């Protein structure tokens, strides 16, 4: 090893010395009068490798310690991200902070922060594990052959799993000062990145244009990220053709090339068992010959240990280890790097007089004007009101990012980016410009779940014109399973008027209902409902209010009771008016760490289309909050109540309590740990519950649950301590999965003291 190191030092010294001697200046006339030494250019080449590219930062840290500043940087994929930021002026410490603070699950997805999603989207989307937008124009498809229509629809599906919008806006926010179209030679360190032309398979060297977009193009992994269009070319990850672009660094004038290789070895045959492994292998094979050629041409070859990490290993522990491994690998070349620094002398690769990029998160700007491009002029005012931004005002970078997140939260746009450019008429001021790309307006979504009460179920959703700011939209939902249901809805969103919703509901239900501790009724019924309501006046993210009218129809197919009791099973219809309000500012639906969720609903049933009906009313309410006294511990208090007003009310509107899920068999069913299925209770009902949750591992949660129930014929009876209430307790384990929580609990209550129950579920509830 020592012999190899000495050999490397000798070769490096001879290379640099011979280069310097060869460049001793001659005058223009060929004489020796103009003796000058040409500056030796050092190139830094950073290859692709996904999360493994964090090791590049460790190498840069070592170069900074030695004092080597490259004259040119060339990167591919993640190497373009790290290299581009370094070229803009971010040092290794800042790069480490950026990587450590980044929410990679968010960046590598199409997600919008829950706080920025509209309330209606919260209600609808947190049921599905996959949603696929598409933009087929159904008018255009009308009249075509069936196979042509299907093909036209498929062409409008997205070209990648992730649109890359979140990554692009991260880069945009870090490139303030270099967001406009420029030559990358004007950066503090000249820079270039590599992409692949998807139409020809050719290598594309990106050394001018919109820097963040070029960096994003270079890391467009085929199938994962949507391709990027630049100058009429459809570009994907440069690693397909040139993952270690030493040759490009040479063309950019580099005399000495430091190459950092974080590419994994080719995958063994017995490990090619998954789709991602096959895709990565294909990409590696396509550019392998050029990779081997460039590897030989690197003067200083640095190979960090990335053997234990994958393309998506962006968790904090992995990033910390990769950074250390990068530093260690560079430190093993310490003698060579020190020798190179001595030969270079005081020459500095970076031009310290060139302005460094600003991080938008740490800056404020005097913005004289805000412009919008790519939207209907009539929507501009609406979006301005939504963002809360004001022209001729001091605006922070966080406010700009918040506005982008709000725009994305409408789901009307597949891409929202921004540009901060200097206002030439006002010294030190900026013009903020937002760019919008419309999203596919339609969506197909799929949800799936299993639980021990109803077995397996699937939810299918088709939204037509769903991802639009205003106008009409429709949706069709089918729940397939033991208790199937369907929902057909149409809504019209006005710009300056409450939203109008019209819904038709169908539901077939087979359920065991307990009328007391020992008596069970088996009921099977068909429900049809028609509802029209006005909803929020404007775009609300945490609040929703509705006012409407509803027609319910119940047809009982079976009503088996263990006690002799007359039950009228004829079809019955009820007309009601209702109002409801909901609020939800929790940071997560399934495992929140802060926030409050509440719902209040009042209904007046004024008509029953059968004899003996008397008008009655009902009031329902629930509230839950999350308090986190420690990092992994949460206390979740909850309250549920429902009161039927008037002594005589109808069977479908009794108070039903039981099970782990709210609203399973009837909309107003209240959950209670310790009672399986559902049971009937008196007119006035109150349930208090507290969950104690501990996050003992990354996605693993343990619960202790206690709930208490009181009921009475009237509110006074319910609150009276002349009779005792019911207690229920449970222990639960939950695991966060991509299709929803996996949960198992065991429970007991004094409603039925003889039995300990159990419940298993997987997936979001619907």
What are these regions (language model features)?
Residues 1-29, 643:
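Bacterial Sec-dependent N-terminal signal peptides
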Residues 22-76, 84-405, 409-422, 439-440:
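Patatin-like phospholipase
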Residues 49, 79, 95, 201, ...:
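Buried hydrophobic packing residues in well-ordered domains
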Residues 195-197, 207, 304, 374-376, ...:
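Flexible glycine-/small-residue-rich
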Residues 398, 415-431, 435-586, 657-671, ...:
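Gram-negative/organellar outer-membrane beta-barrel architecture
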Residues 443-446, 578-582, 586-697:
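C-terminal outer-membrane beta-barrel translocator/porin domains of Gram-negative envelope proteins
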Residues 467-473, 495-499, 539-544, 587-596, ...:
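Short loop/turn motifs that connect adjacent beta-strands in outer-membrane beta-barrel proteins
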Residues 693-727:
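C-terminal hydrophobic structural anchor segments
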């Amino acid at each position: 090893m020592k012999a190899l190191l000495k050999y490397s030092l000798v070769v490096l010294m001879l290379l640099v010395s011979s280069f310097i001697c060869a460049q001793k200046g001659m005058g223009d006339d060929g004489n020796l009068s103009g003796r000058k030494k040409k500056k030796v250019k050092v190139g830094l080449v950073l290859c692709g490798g996904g999360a493994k590219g964090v090791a590049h930062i460790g190498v840069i840290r070592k170069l900074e310690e030695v004092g080597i500043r490259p004259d040119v940087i060339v990167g591919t994929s993640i190497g373009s991200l790290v290299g581009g930021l370094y070229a803009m002026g971010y040092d290794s410490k800042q790069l480490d902070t950026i990587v450590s603070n980044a929410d990679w699950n968010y960046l590598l997805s199409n997600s919008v922060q829950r706080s920025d999603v509209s309330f209606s989207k919260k209600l609808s989307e947190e049921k599905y594990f996959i949603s696929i937008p598409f933009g087929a124009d159904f008018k255009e498809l009308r009249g075509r052959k069936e196979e042509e229509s299907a093909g036209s629809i498929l062409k409008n599906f997205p070209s990648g799993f992730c649109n890359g919008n979140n990554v692009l806006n991260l880069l945009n926010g870090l490139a303030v000062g270099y967001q406009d179209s420029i030559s990358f030679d004007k950066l503090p360190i000249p820079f270039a990145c590599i992409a692949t032309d998807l139409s020809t398979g050719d290598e594309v060297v990106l050394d001018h244009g919109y820097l963040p977009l070029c960096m994003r193009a270079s890391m467009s992994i085929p199938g994962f990220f949507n391709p990027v269009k630049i100058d009429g070319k459809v570009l994907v990850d440069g690693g397909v053709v040139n993952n270690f672009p030493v040759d490009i660094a040479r063309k950019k004038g580099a005399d000495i090339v430091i190459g950092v290789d974080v590419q994994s070895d080719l995958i063994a045959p017995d490990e090619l068992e998954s789709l991602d492994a096959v895709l990565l292998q294909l990409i590696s094979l396509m550019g392998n010959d050029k990779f081997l050629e460039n590897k030989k041409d690197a003067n200083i070859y640095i190979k960090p240990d990335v053997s234990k990490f994958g393309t998506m290993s962006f968790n904090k522990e992995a990033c910390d280890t990769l950074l250390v491994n990068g530093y260690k690998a560079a430190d093993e070349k310490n003698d060579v790097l020190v020798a190179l620094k001595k030969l270079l002398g005081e020459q500095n690769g970076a031009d310290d007089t060139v302005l460094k990029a600003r991080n938008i998160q740490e800056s404020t700007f005097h913005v004289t004007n805000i412009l919008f491009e790519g939207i209907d002029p009539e929507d501009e005012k609406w979006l301005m009101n939504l963002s809360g931004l004001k022209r001729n005002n001091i605006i922070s970078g966080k406010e700009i990012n918040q506005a982008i997140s709000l725009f994305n939260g409408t789901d009307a746009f597949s891409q929202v980016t921004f540009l901060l450019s200097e206002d030439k008429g006002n010294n030190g001021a900026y013009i903020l410009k937002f760019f919008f790309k419309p999203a596919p307006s339609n969506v197909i979504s799929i949800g799936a779940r299993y639980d021990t009460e109803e077995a397996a179920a699937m939810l299918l959703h088709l939204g037509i014109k769903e991802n639009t700011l205003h106008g009409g939209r429709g949706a069709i939902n089918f729940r397939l399973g033991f208790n199937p249901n369907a929902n057909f809805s149409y809504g019209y969103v006005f710009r300056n008027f409450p939203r109008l919703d019209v819904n038709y509901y169908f539901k077939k239900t087979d359920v065991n209902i307990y009328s007391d501790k020992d008596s069970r009724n088996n009921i099977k019924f068909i429900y049809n409902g028609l509802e029209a309501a006005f909803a929020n006046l404007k775009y609300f993210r945490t609040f929703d209010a509705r006012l409407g009218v509803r027609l319910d129809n119940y047809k009982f197919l079976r009503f088996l009771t263990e006690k002799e009791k007359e039950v009228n099973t004829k079809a019955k219809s009820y007309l009601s008016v209702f109002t409801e309000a909901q609020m939800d500012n929790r940071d997560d639906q399934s495992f929140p760490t802060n926030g409050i969720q509440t719902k209040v609903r009042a209904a007046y049933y004024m008509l029953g289309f059968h004899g003996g009906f008397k008008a009655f009313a009902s009031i329902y309410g629930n509230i839950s909050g999350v308090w986190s006294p420690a990092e992994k511990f949460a206390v979740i208090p909850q309250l549920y109540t429902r009161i039927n007003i008037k002594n005589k009310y109808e069977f479908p509107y009794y108070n039903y309590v039981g099970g782990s899920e709210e609203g399973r068999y009837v909309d107003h069913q209240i959950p209670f740990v310790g009672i399986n299925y559902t049971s009937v209770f008196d007119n006035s009902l109150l349930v208090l519950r507290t969950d104690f949750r501990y996050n003992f591992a990354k996605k693993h949660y343990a619960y202790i649950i206690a709930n208490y129930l009181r009921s009475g014929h009237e509110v006074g009876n319910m609150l009276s301590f002349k009779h005792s209430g019911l207690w229920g307790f449970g222990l639960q384990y939950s695991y966060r999965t991509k299709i929803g929580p996996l949960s198992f609990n065991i429970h007991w209550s004094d409603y039925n003291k003889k039995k300990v129950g159990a419940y298993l579920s997987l997936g979001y509830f619907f």
